[in-house]
Amino acid sequence: MIGSKTKRKAREESGASSKPGTNSPANAKGKAKNQTTKAVKAEPKEEWGNQAEARDEAVARTQPAISTEPKTVTWKVKKKKDKTNARVMAQAKTELPAGPALVPHTKSDALPTSVVITVTKSEVKIDTGIEASLKGAAKATDKRSIKQKPEIKKEVCVKSRAGDKAKEVCVKSSAGDKAKEVCVKSRAGDKAKEVCVKSRAGDKASIVINTTDEDEDYVCSWFWTGEEPSVGSWFWPKEENPLQVYQPPPKVEEEPEPPDTFDYALKKKAAAWLRGRFIVLVPIEEPQPSLPPDGNWTLVATLIETPLGIRPLTKIPPYGGPYFQTLADLKNQIREKEKYGPNPNTCRCKSRTFSLEPVDFDKLVALLKLTRDPFIHEIATMIMGISPAYPFTQDIVHDVGITVMIENFVNNPNAKKYPRTLNINANPDAPEEVKETEAHVNKVCRDILCCPLNCSVQVEELKLLVSLSVKFDYHHVVIYYVRYFISLLNKGSVKIKFQILRVLLCLSKNQANTRELISAEVMSSLVALFHKNESKANILHIIEIFENINFQFKKRAKLFTKEMFTKSELISIFREAKEFDQKLQDLTDHSDPDVRDKVIRLILKL
């Protein structure tokens, strides 16, 4: 409908101009000028609206579109009327700037701009020059149509704020029951201005476009083009220093401290064995050429078993080997201490230092030659300053006297009562002493056999024999009486059996006694006691005896040749072994868990 009305008006204007005397260019210019002048004089009250409209036209002339290429507005009318319309538009373009309602437009931030979008049903493309001429030509027709159709309204609201406020352009138009709205909002300061332009477009219908915040950039691009991507850059220059975003420093993960893996139990064990170490002064029968001629006595480091292994009791010098210190060296050290005083670099834990004169030292050495008691030698080493001493030990030695204490220990008869049990020296005894000991062991074995059966004296003698059988030196004497002890094992009480089994257990640890222990008589007696009614202690002892025999037999099997055993002995051994195997199977169901474990381990070893 809108297009048909526009075409009808164009035809009327073209028909009037086609009459004689009116189709000249001068008549067309005059007609357009008269129409423009009449329109301005007829409505003086609408000066503000015309001024806003002129600003819109100026904006259309100066502001380029989104695309930088020039665009034209093409009106689809008859080809023979194009020249007349073009001349009318050119005349209107030249006269509009002279009108009182036009305000020249400059690109300033303080001057508010207005936007009027008038679209007909025909194809529209925005151009800076042609659009202004079209609006100037259609101005008169719009004024005449205001009185005929009051229901068509058009409102343009332009709101702008200088500073940080918002700028809003609202274009409202109505055509019958349809309405659309264009809102452009921008912020530029704290002030606001508002321009409202109302116009009525006769038979033309405006298209109103509503925009939201999302389409803000797209709508603004119709009127402003630039390289600035933000709306705020239209009113103030781009900030030189952009906002800095706070970023927390990266967290540095601290490595956890390694846990304390110190073994305090080992420290306690080490402290325990340190208290039991000692050094023995022993004579050297064959003097070595490297030692001084007067150095007949040396301090020999005793090797003991510690939690960390076998270690010497004294310090090892850099060159290696045992730690030897002659008495001459000790005398020189004593003279140096007497001359220069005590060494300041000594351990502070020593509250008092020993002062030993050379005469006292010689007397002490003479006393040490009379005894081999390790306790007396330990005290002597503390007095000489070789081994550390505790404060209370130092006080006792000083109160009693050094030489007096050693002399009392040497002359004490209790010190000579059990010299063998206290002596730990590895050197062999003298031949006379060995003979005396062997005679003593032989006498003990005879006393055991001569005593009444199951008497208390017999039990005590067996206990003494157990202590003498600990060392391998006298096993050759005890093994001679094994066949007599087997008879006591079969006839004696529980206590007698227990002590005899202890003696056999000590003998089974020696490899030289293996052949005698695996004889037919011993094996049969041990197997006979291997039943559930026997006491737990006796069964455990028998199991240990067989474990030792099995270990020694497998370790040195090549030594047991056919010449060592007769045929009857080998048959009896295998026969007893078969019976022993059956009894082991029966003891796997023993009520005591310790016995069951021992039996199972022995079966696995065999």
Curated annotation (Swiss-Prot):
| ARM repeat windows | 349-388, 470-509, 511-551, 568-606
Polar residues: compositionally biased ranges: 15-26
**Amino acid composition bias (Basic and acidic residues), ranges on this chain:** 40-59
Where, by tissue, is this protein expressed? Highly expressed in the developing neural tissues, neural crest derivatives and hind limbs.
* Region span, Disordered: 1-85
Query: Which terms are listed as keywords in the entry?
Result: Repeat
Q: Which family does it belong to?
A: Belongs to the eutherian X-chromosome-specific Armcx family.
- Report the protein name in the record: Armadillo repeat-containing X-linked protein 5
What is the source species?
Mus musculus
